[in-house]
From Swiss-Prot:
Species the sequence originates in: Homo sapiens
Keyword Cytoplasm (UniProt): no
Ranges occupied by WD repeats: 21-65, 68-107, 112-156, 168-208, 214-254, 319-358
Gene3D superfamilies hit by this protein: YVTN repeat-like/Quinoprotein amine dehydrogenase
Coiled coil: none
Keyword Flavoprotein: no
A Pfam cross-reference name: WD40
Keyword terms, alphabetized: Repeat, WD repeat
Gene name as annotated: WDR89
The protein, known as: WD repeat-containing protein 89
Length: 387
């Protein structure tokens, strides 16, 4: 079996999205899980103007656009069993659209509590439950839950929540991620540095909390990995990386597999630079965890993850001209979608003929929007380098 590092090194750009009337940072990418003959494969992209664009994957042309106006959308996720696309909104709702229909209004609206500002969310693997995380308001930072299923007895498009967890985070809930195959397991990350694992099949919040891990810094990304997805990894806004093994919760073995306060200081990039982390990539077939990072000039780095540390394996270049914000790896055809601050969505495929195009420079975006996108912290890194 070809290793993912070989697949990654063999990627070439086959398509670049066309320019849009309003260039934006591309902050999140997800692809439709339903593939049908005769139907185009859909890609949903979260944009820094608070909207979601739907693209045809092969041509990368914009098919339609959904807005959360007057709120801003945070996160983007396709359902697992249909072409519904979801996003959390700062107006206190989670919205759901039919990605194949150009309709402004959501087909479903999941309402939170009056003061909720949702900044993270996910839907579980059987499409039954949605969980969204809020900004801290007063002393509350919540995880709010809904039943996502359509009810033939109640055709209302608006749904109230099932309830909320309120005791386990003390600051903004920046990340929510359900287990890939267990619909009852969910992990949340927060600006308070805590990463909490819950079994939502258990009635009350205190008993549902399986374990708490501490990254000691604001959480920017979390995910599941390992055989049976019994490990979790975490990245922080100051480029830290943490990896925990839940198999060891009831043993004498340490739960922490890896603890790196600042990846930029420890990974040997040889002649290159590593400016930030983008996300993690667990390859189920090879049981390997990889970390994706990049440079401010658009180069993308693949790093192998083991208990001895992170190792730079290979890099992609010649695509983006600025910070890369998002990626989506397709296991079926080993293709990669990337997006970033140059407003370009790129499709990479293995062994393809390289497409040439003119690079776009990074854009300046409004400060109000900039507050809602991930800002990589260089301050602590620069301070330590001076010491």
């Amino acid at each position: 079996m070809e290793k993912i590092e070989e697949q990654f090194a063999n990627l070439h750009i086959v398509k670049c999205s066309l320019g849009t009337k309003e260039p934006t940072y591309l902050l999140g990418i997800d692809t439709s899980k339903t593939v049908q003959a005769g139907k185009e494969n859909l890609v949903a992209v979260l944009c820094s103007n608070g909207s979601i664009r739907i693209y045809d994957k092969e041509r990368l042309n914009v098919l339609r656009e959904f807005s959360g106006y007057p709120g801003l959308l945070n996160g983007v996720r396709f359902a697992n069993s249909c072409d519904s696309v979801y996003s959390a909104c700062t107006d206190g709702t989670v919205k759901c659209w039919d990605a194949r229909v150009a309709r402004e209004k959501p087909v479903q609206l999941f309402k939170g509590y009056p003061s909720n500002i949702f900044i993270s969310f996910d839907i579980n693997c059987n499409d039954h439950i949605i969980c969204a995380g809020t900004e801290k308001v007063d002393d509350d930072a919540l995880l709010v839950f809904w039943d996502a299923r359509m009810n033939s007895q109640n055709l209302s498009t608006t749904k109230d929540s099932l309830g909320a967890y309120s005791e386990t985070h003390s600051d903004d809930v920046t990340q929510v991620r359900f287990h890939p195959s267990n619909p009852n397991m969910v992990v949340s990350g927060s600006s308070d540095g805590l990463v909490n694992v819950f079994d939502i099949n258990i009635d009350n919040e205190e008993d549902a909390l399986v374990t708490t891990c501490n990254s000691i810094s604001s959480v920017s990304c979390i995910g599941w990995s390992g055989k049976g997805y019994k490990q979790i990894y975490c990245m922080t806004h100051d480029e830290g990386f943490y990896w925990w093994d839940l198999n060891h919760l009831d043993t004498d073995e340490p739960v922490t597999r890896l603890n790196i306060q600042d990846v930029r200081e420890v990974v040997n990039m040889k002649e290159d630079a590593l400016d930030y982390l983008i996300g993690g990539l667990y390859h189920e077939k090879t049981d390997t965890l990889h970390v994706i990072g990049g440079t401010n000039k658009g180069r993308i780095h693949l790093m192998n993850c083991s208990m001895s540390g992170l190792t730079h394996v290979t890099s992609l270049q010649g695509g983006h001209a600025a910070t890369v914000r998002s990626f989506c790896w397709n296991v079926q055809d080993d293709s990669l979608l990337t997006g970033g601050e140059d407003a370009q969505l790129l499709l990479w495929k293995p062994g393809a003929i390289e497409k040439t195009f003119t690079k776009k420079e990074s854009m300046k975006i409004a400060s109000s929007v900039h507050q809602r996108v991930r800002v990589h912290s260089n301050d602590s890194y620069k301070r330590r380098k001076k010491q």
